[in-house]
Swiss-Prot record:
Species the sequence originates in: Dictyostelium discoideum (Social amoeba)
Domain Rab-GAP TBC intervals: 63-244
GO molecular function (one): GTPase activator activity
Lineage: Eukaryota, Amoebozoa, Evosea, Eumycetozoa, Dictyostelia
Name by which UniProt lists this protein: Putative mitotic check point protein BUB2
GO cellular component terms, A-Z: cytoplasm; spindle
Pfam families, alphabetized: RabGAP-TBC
Amino acid sequence: MVIKDLSPHNNSLRKKYLDLIDYGNKNPLTVDPNLYQLRKTILLEGLPPETEEEIEDRTKQDGSKCSLRGMIWKILLGVDKIQPDKYIELIEKGPSNRYQKIRKDIGRTFNRDSQFSQAVSQDQLSRCLNAFAHQCEELGYVQGMNAICGTFLYVLPEVEAFQCFYSLLTQCCPNYFTSNISGVNDASKLLDRILEFVDPELYEYLQNRSYHPLLFTPPILSLGTATPPLDELLKLWDFFLAFGFHLNVICTISQILLMRDVLLVHQSPCLLFRSFPELDAPTIINLSIHIIRQLPDDIYDLLVDHPMTSVDLTPFDRDPNNLNSFNGSGEFDNDNDNDNGNQDEEDDDDDDIDDGHNDYFNDNDE
């Protein structure tokens, strides 16, 4: 349920975001420090609840106004120029060659969430997904895109939602949506190693009970959209869009750790992974930040890169003579020389979210 809280604190927080957005629009040369402040505010304070006006506009289904969350998501994705003519041109091409698959998935999209069904029509989903399949034939359509697209349609007007959807899939995590979903497979391997690193006891218990990291393909591929409720998912996405969707791997681990007590007394714990408990975004984010602070730089760098490009995980493959690559003390044992160690100086100017490992998430942020 959406909280309709118009308290002085939330009004003040809303004004803070609007002032940041206004300053950024008027001072385009300050984009980097402005983005830094925007991300920092999201991390420390979150976004304020929606206003009555935003809720009413969204439930019209033809609402044309962009909510505060929508404005912030567009900024974080670098979507500034809206191209309605291009979108109409794609729609006019009609059903794509993936139409039958898209049609099957549309009816499953947040079908238990009444607020979603009031705000987003199946026609909107169909138009967006078929338009994407036309515009990006190399990616086409992969199951899970429907919920990702639906999330944008819930927050943004249709044309803007499409452009954000396109930007996310092609610029933030294209490796997840190749024909062999290679980025998702890499994410599963990274999840496996990081879970072992942060909780060796739980990891060993799962290993002895039919555990396999590919069990977590659905929450990774869906970017968290497979677990309700939707209003908590939006808070997770605020975090992901601010700091990178690679953090979905860490947040999935956090969800596993929050189930720890139940898992350790269950004879078939892996059955519980078919459906995670409902999202509690603040708890998941706080635990994820704690995990991030523990990670060695080489592991974090691979985590950052894997949604964008293929990463070499062979240095971290299990040695059959030594199944414990992690030594269980918070350090990674690896004698192989590789290029995935500390970040080179030439990367210092890169405005990617990997600076967050050393900057946004330091101990002074809480």
